[in-house]
Amino acid sequence: MIEISCIRIFCADTIRKLNKKIDKAIFPGLLGGPHNNQIASVAVALYEANTKEFKDYSKQVVKNAKVLSDTLIKNGVRVISKGTDSHLVLVDVWNGGTKSKNSFGGLSGKQAEKLLEDNGIIVNKNTIPFDTRSAFDPSGIRLGTAAETTLGKNEKDFEQIANRIVNILKNA
């Protein structure tokens, strides 16, 4: 009976010590309570998202993305999924556009990202479906329209942006 009590005491003591170590490792580093500034910022974001202005802005973001995508396609660029229904456009720069003189195939996503950045257009290198290249130097680039729409750009502006992208990549 004494041996069993010692084991129970030893186990209980070990479990208590282990619990303290786990609690110390998790809180406050990994867990914590909500912060008032975070709660307030979520409240403001939800309020703004419910306004007519934000709904109009969101619609304009998608319109701009569609114009960007359509203009790239008209220039022979291979847009993944042949268009967009969101704020993003995914472009294959490795295989490029093969249906027109604007073809710029053979650029990696990393090269295209740098070329466009050097010309004042910020995009992200991005893998594309069935990409055979590394995620660090993929075949595609991802274009978004939210930032420029926030600055007041419209469909006409995005048509010009698309043409500029094609010219930059074609002349690389």
Show where each model-derived region lies:
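Short, well-ordered loop/turn and helix-capping segments at boundaries between secondary-structure elements
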Residues: 28, 48-51, 95, 118, ...
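PLP-dependent enzyme catalytic core of the Aspartate aminotransferase-like
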Residues: 63, 99-101, 135-172
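Active-site C-terminal subdomain of aminotransferase-like
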Residues: 1-99, 105-108
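A structural signal for short secondary-structure junctions
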Residues: 81-84, 115-117, 134-138, 153
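Conserved PLP cofactor-binding pocket of PLP-dependent enzymes
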Residues: 118-142
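Generic non-transmembrane alpha-helical segments
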Residues: 67, 71-75, 111-119, 168
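Helical (often loop-to-helix) elements that flank the catalytic cores of nucleotide-handling enzymes
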Residues: 100-120, 152-154
